[in-house]
Amino acid sequence: ALQAFHLTSLADRVCVDVGASTGGFTDCLLQHGAKKVFAVDVGYGVLDWKIRNDTRVVVMEKQNARYITTFHEPIDLVVIDASFISLRTLLPVVRQWLNAPKGEVVALIKPQFEAGRSETARGSGVIRDPEIHRAVLRQVLEFAQKEGYTAEGLIRSPLTGPKGNIEFLAHLIYPGETPADVERLIEGLPWNEGTTADQPGQPEPEGKLK
């Protein structure tokens, strides 16, 4: 996603990785030159040992991002790969962290955690209906823009989530200047490639390309 959104040069940027887990996204940020990464996760002891001991990484375990009001320095870029919580809960919090005049967010949109319970239950936790995918993307991106972000880009994630769930990546700018055409972003996705989750999710590789 960093390459897709032209975020390949992160020199001097201070970043936050929400849902750091083993550190795949953190590693990706470091490889692209991030000055510092705050690795935030509700879990404990999961972060890869090498990443944990990198002097550019600030490990923040047992921390729920929704309750973090500020960091001790302005944040330039936030990446989000969170489960069991909606981006509509996180985005209003994240905007408080961002460094004016231009903060950026790369967020993984997971329909299985954004759709209603009835839609999720029908597929035993797997969202197969492309119309639900579209509705979720519309809800999240329109919400983000109401919160002052601009939806700068949207792609389908090259990796599926648990149980083969199809997921998406959004690039948001805060504060946004001109609202994006959300429908155009959504319809620009490769829907003809199919959105039926039939295969089990693949484990995310070290230094996952996001």
PLM ranges: what are they?
Residues 28-36, 100:
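Conserved S-adenosyl-L-methionine
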Residues 10-21:
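Conserved class I S-adenosyl-L-methionine
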